Amino acid sequence: MLVPFISKPVHIDDAAYVAIAKHIAKDPADYYGLSLNWDGVARPVYEWHASPPFVKFYLAFIGTLFGWKEWVLHTAFLLPAILASAATFLLAKRLCKRPFVALAATLCTPAFIISGTSLMLDTWLLAYFMLAMALWVEGFARGSIRYLFCAAICAGLALWTKYFGIALIPLLTVYALLKSDRPKYWWVLLLVPTAMLIAEQAYSYFTYRHFLFTNVAHVVMDERISDRTVYTWLLIGLSFAGGCTFSVMQLGGVLWNGRLRLLGTLLWLAMSFLLVWLTSRDNVTLTAGFKLPTVSIFVYAVLLLGGSQLFSLTYSELRHRADPESWLLALWIAGTFFFACYVTWSVNVRSLLPLVPAVAMLAARRLDFIEVVNPKKTNRRIVTILSVSAIVSLLIARADMEWAQSQREAAYRYGDFAKSHHGTVYFQGHWGFQHYMHEAGVAQFDAKTTVLQPGDVVICPRNNANVRPIPRDYTAARAHDQFSIAHR
């Protein structure tokens, strides 16, 4: 499903990853030694970038060997998607009787498809996360120390990909304690990912006199919106979780009996409408200063219903089974959700991606013990539901690709303008727009060092990131073009 998007332009944070990868191709030992303007001022990457370098090294390897064309890089990123899919299926075979349903419910989500079309770290994290989980569970099932050792290595590679990989250590520990009858000395293996994290941090400190792990805390403290309440973050998190696991939300008609479906739908829709209405009265916490239209409130309520279903599934699982696998999935979902809502700097699909396979497996496990009167009819319903979810997810991914294309087209248009303009043309903004403006040879505006002269132009995209207002005391303050990057 990702193949149609291999020509997708560089988008969102892809631009930073590609820029760092090109630097690594020239100087791999000093991987974060370049300066990059990502918030309006050029700063060394090691001062602000909040993730380990593994994915950038992978991009550098691919770009050096095969070139930096978008289709080359996106083709290379099919590998982590394949690994994540294989690991999800391997784990689902151990945890449920319908592994193909769990796999399809994972793949047919907007979270998986959109993340799979990016050049960022999230699909690689999911691949190593799922490999670590699958090999750890398989190792205990077989009593194999080799599987457990490979799981520990994958956990370390997850940590080298994104620091969220540290969540694997407590999850694997809890599962091992619940399965503590065999094999022995498993705890020694969990020192492997810990040692890999320490080694990565030690190298960054000796190279830059700076622990990269501390950047995570700085980003959260500097960027997180502080005037939102715990309740508001919960609403946002539930709505995002519902959208990320759209396939499982659609399966609700199969997973619950008629009375529960009716009762749950009425209850959660009523609560959702009430909560969204109350929250929409506060123009700061949820709506960013604008009033939500009725249609948006309805969609928001549906997403809240889907997000709430995750915890209904978790409760049902623990009530009926409460085996080590149930606790593993429950803690996996709860921990990821808490991290995405209350730890990371903003609630986003990328942070919630790791819980998608766990939710899909919970849904498949529920199908294992519910009474099915007509199995063939139920299977047809499941196939239909997952097909609809796949179509919706592909349409969302297509819209995201069109947004990326619009940024590239705008950059090329303003690049042509810069070549014919007599003064100097600068630009603000980041993401893919920044990448293609650099390709077009347009200078980036730096709030600290740029001095504007009469006749200069500053291009300011209104719906981009970190676009700073031009001070009125600048000579050329009135000679700037503000525009919105949007679909045609």
Q: Where are the predicted features?
A:
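Loop-to-helix entry region of an early transmembrane alpha helix in multi-pass inner-membrane enzymes
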Residues: 53-60, 65-86, 115, 119, ...
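Short acidic/glycine- and proline-prone juxtamembrane loop motifs at membrane-interface regions
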Residues: 11, 117-125, 348
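Transmembrane-helix signature of polytopic, membrane-embedded enzymes
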Residues: 88-110, 126-127, 142, 146, ...
